[in-house]
Design a protein with these regions (language model features):
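Active-site-proximal substrate-binding groove within the catalytic cores of carbohydrate-active enzymes
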Residues: 1-169
């Protein structure tokens, strides 16, 4: 029975976790030509236990965070409150549930329609193909290309739109 949700869980609790919240999507080291982050934890967990990345409504750049979620096979997540108050600053307004109902529903439905069949698939590879273009491979012969750049990229007779992704089966 895996009904437990954990945040940044450790190995000891994984056997009981149904979902892990807030898995880091970046590295603590500065990336360079000599060092680039690898989604090692995500590659081990994907298809075994579900996980989320950073809360989308708390992200500085929601579009880039969504691309990271797609690239790393993570589910979208939001952090809200339903307190009855008038937000006094931006941070509190991004936490207020009513401000996000429509947007979050769109995000969840979009992710579910495109990626629901990958939730149980194993992530078998993820590599940088060129600057700003990454490919994640799954054991069901699915490839997800993510373009982090501001320009469309042509690769192997495909075009991956700027700031977008392309799923290929």
């Amino acid at each position: 029975n895996r009904d437990l949700m954990v945040e940044n869980g450790n190995l000891y609790v994984l056997k009981n976790a149904g979902i892990i919240s807030q898995i880091p999507m970046d590295t603590t080291y500065e990336e360079s030509e000599a060092y680039e982050g690898v989604p090692f934890v995500q590659m081990i967990l994907h298809g075994t236990v579900e996980y989320t990345g950073p809360y989308l409504n708390l992200s500085e750049n929601m579009d880039k965070t969504m691309l990271h979620l797609i690239d790393y096979g993570a589910l979208p997540a939001f952090c809200w409150t339903n307190s009855d108050y008038t937000p006094k600053d931006v941070e509190k307004s991004v936490l207020y549930y009513d401000n996000w109902t429509s947007k979050s529903l769109d995000v969840y439905e979009s992710f579910n329609s495109v990626f629901s069949d990958l939730r149980n698939a194993r992530m078998t590879d993820r590599r940088k193909l060129q600057e700003g273009l990454y490919r994640t491979e799954y054991n069901n012969e699915t490839y997800v290309y993510v373009n982090y750049t501001d320009s469309d990229i042509s690769y192997n007779n495909m075009t991956i739109k700027a700031g977008s992704y392309l799923r290929v089966n």
